Amino acid sequence: MTTKHITIYALMIALTVALSLTVLIPVPATNGFVTLCEAGIYTTASLFGPLGGLTVGAASGLLIDLISGYPQWAIFSFLIHGLQGLISGYFAKKSTTSWLIGLVLGTFVMVIGYLFAGWFLYGWPSGIASIPGNMIQNIV
C-alpha cells in the first residue's frame, strides 16, 4: 500500500462518514439507524478493489457508530462493513456481471451480519426488524 493509496482511503473514509452523518435516519425498533455509508463503501470497492473496500468499510462503519452515539454497534459495523467492502471489491474489477454479483453478495453480508448483530444485542425481533431498513440502505 502506497502513501497515495493511504491518502485516497483516508479521504474516502472522511467522505463516507460525512455523507452518512448528513443522512442519518434512526430506527427505534433496532436501536440503530440507516445511513448512506454503502455509497462510499461500494464506490471505493469498485475503484480500488478489495483492500480499499475493506479499509473504507471497516473504518467508516466504526467511526459512524462512535460519532453518532451508537457505540454498541461499532465493533459489528467494523466487521460487517469491512467484509462487505472486501467482498464487493473482490468482484468489482472482473466484469460488469461480476461487479453486480459483488454488490449482491456485499448486500447479503451486510443484511445477514446486522440480523445476527441485532439478535446478539437485543434479541431476534430486533435482528429481524433490521432487514427492511438494511435492504433499503443498500439499494439506495
Q: What is each model feature region?
A:
Residues 1-140:
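Loop-helix junctions at membrane interfaces
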